[in-house]
């Protein structure tokens, strides 16, 4: 069913609001994907707080107009699904991970930090660990010397007690 003018304006406004908050936009061609698989992709995107939408390309072009993602308009051809996220790598990670298990989802392009990326760029962005993973690694590295020092003190205390006994 075609959208009337008010519906189109509402869609553009909704997508524009998401794009205004976004750090990353990923475009992927979804031709031939079963509805069940697309539903799984949407569920994964929701878990990662990625806005995922199948959208007419003309409406998407209007939504990115005047934003850092405007250069992506040249890539907006064919049946595309748009992944938009506030997290720098979440959209790329969700789409890339799903495309590994479903060869009918083909990453077409993406944009991060005002730069348009090709498929290889999106895959490289997806390979970066998430913020939480990086913070946990940093915390582990910071804790290692402290816990080692604590174990050394405990061993020294045990040794002194053994000598005293």
UniProtKB/Swiss-Prot annotation:
One of its GO terms (molecular function) is large ribosomal subunit rRNA binding. Gene3D superfamilies: 3.30.70.1730, 6.10.250.290. The keyword Coiled coil does not apply. The keyword Translocase does not apply. GO terms for cellular component: ribonucleoprotein complex; ribosome. SUPFAM superfamilies: Ribosomal protein L10-like. One of its GO terms (biological process) is translation. Keywords: Ribonucleoprotein, Ribosomal protein, RNA-binding, rRNA-binding. Pfam families: Ribosomal_L10. Part of the ribosomal stalk of the 50S ribosomal subunit. The N-terminus interacts with L11 and the large rRNA to form the base of the stalk. The C-terminus forms an elongated spine to which L12 dimers bind in a sequential fashion forming a multimeric L10(L12)X complex. HAMAP family: Ribosomal_uL10. Belongs to the universal ribosomal protein uL10 family. PANTHER family: 39S RIBOSOMAL PROTEIN L10, MITOCHONDRIAL. Forms part of the ribosomal stalk, playing a central role in the interaction of the ribosome with GTP-bound translation factors. This is Large ribosomal subunit protein uL10. It comes from Burkholderia cenocepacia (strain ATCC BAA-245 / DSM 16553 / LMG 16656 / NCTC 13227 / J2315 / CF5610).
